[in-house]
Amino acid sequence: MVNPGIRAATRRLRVAVILLYAWMPHAWADSIDDRLAPCLACHGEKGQSNIPEVPSLGAQTSPYVLIQLYLFREKLRRFEIMNEAVKGFTDDDLRTFADAISKLPAPPPTTDTTDPARMVRGQALVRQHRCNVCHSPDLAGRDAVPRIAGQREDFLVKTMREYKGNIRAGYDASMGDVMQPIPDADILDLAYFTARQP
């Protein structure tokens, strides 16, 4: 478990770095790779996050990223770091970032499969709750539906709990509705299985 003081200090440092980049004029960067640098400071090199509860972005669908960036910019989805990071972005900026993020490599799945029973339960739950209908059969997402395969397990748990608790804002209510009847034990198994998919 991460020391709460260290977690708070790390969060403040990340906020400071992102705010520094967000307040600088767009002319500071020569390329999209340069402009993505502050994003990857938190979301990880090549979009593969190593920070607890911070999602990996690699191979995320461009329409989904565009919608999320828009929600952050308009403060329809509230998370201070992200709201500040994109507040000055134009619609073209949002599209450019969404396209660039979608071209990052997919994160490798978690390889620790020490609990085969949880894998079996998780796979059955994916079918039972039809996650593979919207998120695609391989959970790689499509169109405005996000890639969840290989995503950080802790982020998946956090996100599903937020949808279940009607805390997570979205552009429609479908995930909140889907998550309502799912008990926490099933959320843990769903996340365990999904994080280990390529």
What are these regions (language model features)?
Residues 1-11:
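N-terminal secretory signal peptides that target proteins for export/translocation
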